[in-house]
Amino acid sequence: VKHEQTRKKTAPPANHQALSKPESVKAASAKTEHAANEPMPKWAKYRSEMASEFPSPFRGTKDPLAEQIGKFVSRLDQLRPEEGGPAFLGKNPALTYEYPGVKNIEINQEMGDLDTVLDDVVKLFEGAPNWGNPLTMCNVIPQGNTAAIIASMLSQVFSANILEGEYAWNVHRAELETAGMLGNLVGWDPVKTGCIYTWGGGGCWTYGLKYGLTRVLPDSMAKGIRTDAKIICSQQAHFVQKNASAWMGLGMDNIVHVRTDEKTNQMDVTHLEEILKDLAAKKIPVATVVCTMGTTDASAFDPIGKVRKILDRYPNPKGYGKAILYADAVVGWSWAYFKDYDFAKNPLEFSERILLILKQNGNAMAELEYADAVGIDFHKVGWAPYVSSCFLYKNAEEFEKLHHWAGDAYLQVRTPYNPMYYTLEVSRTASGSLAGWATLKYFGKSGMQAILGGILETKYYLYDLLKQQKDMVCVNPDDSGLITLFRVYPKDVDATAQYKK
């Protein structure tokens, strides 16, 4: 009934009203006159004031949200420094709270003033990093692009909840089309690809582990983890491995680390084979093998194509499912834009100096097609606001069936896409999916290629400048990523000689 009333403009039946029109008008007038003579109760005064400051659901009416956004633009500008100013927001870089004493606070009895509350919100950003400032140097926290910011904000205005179809409606296209676009980028069948926007790179890692546990231990959905299945990852894998293994109930002791090459930071596939051979002999199952496809600083890529071949040679013992190969590409994913770049024609006119690096990175990411699932952060090398992380999986039908619990939720299915049945979260904001989707649409392939290549051009320009300074030395000149690490010594010290010591 609710659905029919909200989706269709159906006229009420003739007997819908209990009173005839003249009688209902008289009754309403009498009721209004009586109410006008009585004082408004306090709760109604509070409610009236609060309701007047909520966003308007209708066009052409006074909208408190629009008014506050206008004021917000002015507040935003006050936080920004003048050009050439410091790398932080506002005027005070100090931390203005003490821990844990900051928590010794109570809720006010009286209702607050909207302008005052929003002024206090702005004050919270005093001293915060200004990611768009050229003086701000942090590894992978870029400024969000405008398309993604506005898209994300729209979700907050209309509270799109992407747990199921009726609460999201066409907003679900952002997540579904992301799956198709990224599936195409990776080299999978886009229609068979699925994705879930989740709480960060840690969420992607956790989903990758959960996928492996559910596929390898079929009874675990109902009976829990009763077998010490193993997680295999390199020594360079992200520390979230500990969070994911602990929270999934498998335990950190079941993480097995593969040695990495000292020069390349890549997984040693010979050692990987030794580990898999040993586990197979002991009849110990492997849940998930994780390839790190782009470490934060060194931008190292594990040879995932070779890992796939070795993993397939050592299947799990009888009675267990096939292990999942998860690619942790939350940092390195966007290099996949160069796997099909025409390096001979070089349409974006990159310098010869960086073409080889772009090709090297693109070739490494071309191997993502061998993965069962890939983790992607748009809020890192995607220039989208936090949090917009995407867990991408190759076989949507398998993943969703494996994780679909039996029965139905009390929410009725009204659309073909209802991820609430198999996601770790239930309620999910559309902010991340809209930000990621808007970024993909806005940048396109050439835009992303241009911004990535442009950073490399700048990186090597900085590298040349550092070489001219005797008291400075670049310590990662051979890395192929976006990060430049350098040391600064006192003026009278030969930086290169000192660093070699």
Predicted regions and their residues:
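N-terminal entrance/gating region of PLP-dependent enzymes' catalytic architecture
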Residues: T32-K192
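Conserved PLP-binding active-site segment of the aspartate aminotransferase-like
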Residues: S299, L482-K501
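Active-site C-terminal subdomain of aminotransferase-like
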Residues: T295, S299, N346-D478, Y489-D492
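Glycine- and acidic
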Residues: V102, F158-E166, D189-I196, I225-A229, ...
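Conserved PLP-enzyme active-site core in the AAT-like
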Residues: G200-G203, Y207, Y211-E400
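Short Gly/Ser/Thr- and Asp/Glu-enriched loop/turn motifs at secondary-structure junctions
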Residues: V191-K192, N476-I483
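Well-ordered mid-protein domain cores that form the structural environment of catalytic cofactors
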Residues: Q143-M248
